[in-house]
């Protein structure tokens, strides 16, 4: 063998060894089971992961080789886990019926293996039946390599996941059955005749008649802000009364990684008397945007930096239909004990408009339209598929998605 060839082979082996050493293998075992949980004071059977409700935080660094063994201990249900927002091979995506993945049968194990090719705030959840609603969801955070901050604006002294979710006393199967009986089954804050009179006084009889006729043609209510109501809203799996708390010390910067893991609830998030700076959206860094409040849609994530000065702050995530709050606390650990939460007064209920529906025009003049709307090919009567409706609420004015890497630090969801 020539000296030149030997030299080339030696370099190749060295590079391979260097790459192999740098790529850490991060392994997790997740056991899916059904257990009794007590969230609202009533013991109920729900899905747990490793005995926890909600599922545990998974942490990686960019470049890791992820190995996640999922053990399905549900008695009569296939299961699955989808890694929301992650770039990975199709067979590892975790959606039954796609990419030759059939789900995980009862008492079987499936091993997810993939290279972690990005960083940011993400989450994971079931893609089987209504298991996500029943508890199979959890946070997932990927740090930059060696957890080195990428920009000065993202540097923080503390780093917390704030997982928002909704819990119902009915199972996902019961909820779906009710919605099949009546699409408006859970609309228990409907308008009354007095609302109609107020609209007539404000807009006039003709305009009111036209507006009401259009909503009737769509078979939809103006109050249909959320498909399901009677939820208890959670923060990191805790009710407002249980008061999830993130600690800090005076002068520290705190990163809050908000994840909306709800089944179908949107939230308006605020921390009274504390400005937030949005630094990331859906795992992607953005030009910093200072805000007093932001709206987070289902499955979205937003990272914010805060610089608390007071001893206590209340984190308030108000549901878009104004039916309740997910609440937690930021607390200076060097001060007096954490204060009890103060339940805010809900803001006035909003009503949908035709503009919200992408229908700010005269429907009655549309040629060939059957006014009962039932014959329109491909139209879902809950209007969720209508062009013009933004479901994920991800567009925030002034936000610049530059797709570059994020940074991150250790999380603490235990408090």
Predicted segments, located by residue:
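Thr-biased low-complexity repeat/linker tracts and other Thr-enriched repetitive architectures
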Residues: 365-415
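Ligand-binding face of N-terminal immunoglobulin V-set domains in extracellular IgSF glycoproteins
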Residues: 299
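Short acidic/polar inter-strand loop motif in beta-rich domains
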Residues: 130-136, 312, 320-327
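Short, hydrophobic beta-strand segments
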Residues: 112-118, 302-310
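Cleavable N-terminal signal peptides
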Residues: 11, 21-22
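Histidine-centered copper-binding motifs that mark active-site loops
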Residues: 23-270, 274-296, 335-372
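Bacterial N-terminal signal peptides that target proteins for export
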Residues: 1-9
């Amino acid at each position: 063998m020539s000296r030149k060839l030997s030299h080339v082979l030696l370099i190749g082996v060295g590079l391979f060894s260097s790459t192999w050493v740098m790529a850490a293998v991060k392994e997790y075992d997740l056991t899916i089971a059904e257990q009794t949980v007590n969230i609202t004071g009533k013991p109920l059977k729900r899905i747990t992961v490793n005995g926890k409700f909600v599922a545990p935080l998974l942490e990686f660094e960019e470049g890791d080789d992820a190995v996640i063994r999922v053990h399905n201990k549900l008695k009569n249900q296939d299961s699955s886990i989808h890694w929301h927002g992650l770039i990975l091979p199709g067979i590892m995506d975790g959606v039954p019926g796609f990419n030759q993945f059939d789900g995980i049968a009862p008492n079987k194990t499936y091993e997810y293996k993939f290279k972690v090719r990005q960083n940011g705030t993400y989450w994971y959840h079931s893609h089987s039946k209504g298991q996500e609603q029943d508890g199979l969801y959890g946070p997932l955070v990927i740090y930059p390599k060696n957890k080195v901050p990428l920009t000065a604006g993202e540097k923080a002294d503390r780093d917390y996941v704030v997982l928002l979710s909704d819990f119902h006393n009915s199972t996902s199967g019961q909820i779906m059955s009710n919605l099949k009986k009546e699409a408006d089954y859970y609309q228990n804050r409907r308008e009354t005749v007095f609302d109609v009179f107020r609209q007539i006084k404000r807009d006039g009889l003709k305009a009111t008649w036209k507006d009401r006729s259009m909503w009737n043609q769509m078979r939809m209510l103006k109050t249909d802000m959320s498909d399901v109501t009677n939820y208890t809203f959670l923060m990191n799996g805790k009710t407002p009364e249980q008061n999830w708390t993130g600690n800090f010390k005076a002068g520290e910067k705190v990163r809050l990684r908000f994840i909306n893991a709800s089944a179908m609830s949107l939230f308006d998030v605020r921390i009274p008397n504390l400005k937030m700076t949005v630094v990331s959206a859906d795992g992607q860094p953005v030009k910093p945007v200072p805000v007093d409040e932001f709206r987070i849609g289902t499955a979205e994530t937003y990272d914010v930096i805060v610089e608390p000065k007071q001893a206590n702050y209340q984190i308030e995530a108000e549901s878009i239909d104004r039916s309740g709050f997910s609440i937690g606390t930021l607390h200076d650990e060097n001060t007096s004990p954490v204060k009890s939460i103060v339940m805010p007064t809900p803001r006035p209920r909003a009503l949908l408009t035709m503009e919200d529906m992408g229908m700010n025009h005269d429907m009655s003049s549309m040629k060939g339209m059957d006014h009962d709307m039932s014959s329109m090919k491909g139209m879902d009567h809950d209007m969720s598929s209508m062009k013009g409706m933004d479901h994920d609420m991800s567009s925030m004015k002034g936000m610049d998605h530059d797709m570059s890497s994020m940074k991150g630090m250790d999380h603490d969801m235990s408090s």
